[in-house]
Amino acid sequence: DPAPLGAAPFALAIDEAMHLPATALDLNLNSGAQAYVLPCIAGHVGADTAAVILSEQPHKSEEPVLIIDIGTNAEIVLGDSKRLLAASSPTGPAFEGAQISAGQRAAPGAIERVRIDPETLEPKVKVIGNDLWSDDPAFDAQVTGLCGSGIIEVIGEMVLARLVTADGIIDGEMASRTSRIEASDRTFSYTLWDGATKIQVTQDDIRAIQLAKGALTAGWRLLMDIAGLQTVSRTVLSGAFGAHIDPLYAMILGMVPDGPLETIIAAGNAAGTGARLALVNGAARREIEDVVRKVEKIETATEAKFQDHFVD
């Protein structure tokens, strides 16, 4: 029955864990193989988030932990041994390179690291598949575009170099200091790479990241408001994108709460780790089934404070 998909919040047809023969899922495995599906938490906070909880164990922490899995929807978990909250924020695809003028997926040739000299305003970059910075005489990589981590770093570096104002405007007056600032209709752009492929950061690019960051930040701020928290003991960034973000730039752009950099941890594929734990450990399966029942689901779409934080 697809009717529940036409209303928000979406009602889950199944939210409990499933244990069934693999043949029931048409998996080409031994006829005696069993399949296990972790429980879902809410409509946009699925079994992958349950696996992240199993991997990172926030429910066993005495201090509050914030877990963020950044994607087209950011899944957010906040809490400790006393209380767990979970929500999803519609960040969109900008963090993954979509909606960015020179954006692309993380692949060889994509810029993943950026530094801008605050005096000369000249950039240097590193690309996937090459260990050298572009100012190294031996650098000969083909530069093809900007992946997610590169987008975050170049905007963070532009902020540090004062090429971007506090409200996210590329400062046209900086054109007097560098030819890399170019007029584009009524806005300006910054030329990051001027090779066979010209790569610029435009005002629209910054706006796209601002919107994505705004949705992400509104999500964890909402959960912190509900939990009555001002700080957390650690922030865990999970998923492929989270594993490649430099914590410094995540903090510069306000993607994570302020705090010591060492408290921001890249967990990598935490969902995969949790899935493997559930695969081989019956006690882990029982544990996560019990924990998920206690998670408080927060629907950002119906929370007025989410919109307030997003606008801020």
Model regions and ranges:
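Gly/Ser/Thr-rich active-site cleft segment
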Residues: 1-29, 140-184
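Nucleotide/phosphate-binding catalytic cleft detector across ATP-hydrolyzing
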Residues: 1-66, 200-201, 205-213, 306-312
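Glycine-rich phosphate-binding loop of actin/hexokinase-like ATP-binding domains
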Residues: 2-19, 51-150, 246-268
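Alpha/propeptide regions of enzymes that mature by internal proteolysis
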Residues: 32-49, 53-65, 125-132, 136-140, ...
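A glycine-rich phosphate-binding loop feature that marks nucleotide/adenosyl-phosphate handling sites
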Residues: 70-72, 171-181, 231-242, 291-302
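Catalytic phosphate/nucleotide-handling subdomain of diverse soluble enzymes
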Residues: 80-85, 225-292
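A contiguous, well-structured pocket-lining segment that forms one wall/lid of small-molecule binding clefts
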Residues: 159-227
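Structural signal for terminal/edge beta-strands and the immediately following C-terminal loop/tail
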Residues: 282-312
